[in-house]
Amino acid sequence: MKKYDVVALGELLIDFTENGKSNQGNPLFEANPGGAPCNVLAMLTKLGHKTAFIGKVGEDFFGEQLRDAITEVGIDASGLCTDKEIHTTLAMVHTYPDGDRDFSFYRNPGADMMLNKEEICEELIKETKIFHFGTLSMTHEGVREATKEAIRIAEESGATISFDPNLRPPLWNSLDEAKEQVLYGLGHCQILKISDNEIQWLTGEEDYTAGVNWIRERYQIPLILVSMGKEGSRAYYNGSIVEVKPFLQKNTIETTGAGDTFCGCVLHYICEHGMEDLKEENLKDMLTFANAAASVITTRKGALRVMPTREEIQNLLIERAAE
């Protein structure tokens, strides 16, 4: 038996999210712990799974805050390294009236980029059922090598590999370089979670199914999930395509972490049920639960510390079924 259900590698940072205005009319920002891979793990931990994180923060106030935050929510932080020279990565999140957002990163460099392959905790990866990663840990040479080394260990250990590109164009030297690394990820995963705009950017196809077919012609990925924001989500598995509508909320504040919450719930379903012989009914159940969880997180500031409980997700499902 492996010790962990899911181990993730990547960025752990502070998301400064707008939280009203001061008496002088200046914007107030709240320092929320964030970073896609840890958001995914936080959702999984909330649902009772054993998780661990591999990454790097600075030896500074924010780095300590982040280590405390992930430990507090139950993520094993033994693979989290500290950089004495480089500060913890920061992101300013600008939220639009509809809850969508834009990011400005303070990462030139940031501690998350400084992880090297010698710092990878092999034991964590060898002891996990699922290994999850994104592309923020592939933007620069050193951390890219660390990510590829972690993928190699995961493959050798027989872990299922999950990939969410989580494209952030400002962090790349060029979008061609970003595409090259996304394609590397596609070549090494069995579960792909990709957003609607990412699939259009990557494949040049406006139609999501045509985009998935483009990917499938090149890579053998058993389970592909497309998150479509206000349109819901789709799962592509073998010959099946299942689409589930979203659970739209009147009181949406921001969408930060919604895709990560969705991804965490998908991995939860795979941890519970495996990936063999999933029927359309299974895929529908998986997407419905994941959409509901993502919907709940849009009503909250931040993500990592405030992931919904199983009960909150079930209550929303019951409430909507009664409407």
Where are these regions (language model features)?
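Conserved phosphate-binding/catalytic region of the ribokinase-like
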Residues: 1-5, 152, 206-323
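Glycine-rich phosphate/adenosyl-contacting loop at the front of the ribokinase-like
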Residues: 1-76, 115, 323
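Active-site metal-binding loops of divalent metal-dependent hydrolases
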Residues: 12, 136, 165, 261
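Conserved N-terminal subdomain of the carbohydrate kinase-like
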Residues: 50-133, 314-323
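Short, electropositive alpha-helical surface patch
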Residues: 62-75, 180-187, 213-216, 248
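Glycine-rich phosphate/pyrophosphate-binding beta-alpha loops
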Residues: 89, 135-139, 294, 300-303
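Conserved beta-alpha-beta core of the PfkB/ribokinase-like small-molecule kinase fold
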Residues: 138-214, 221, 231-232
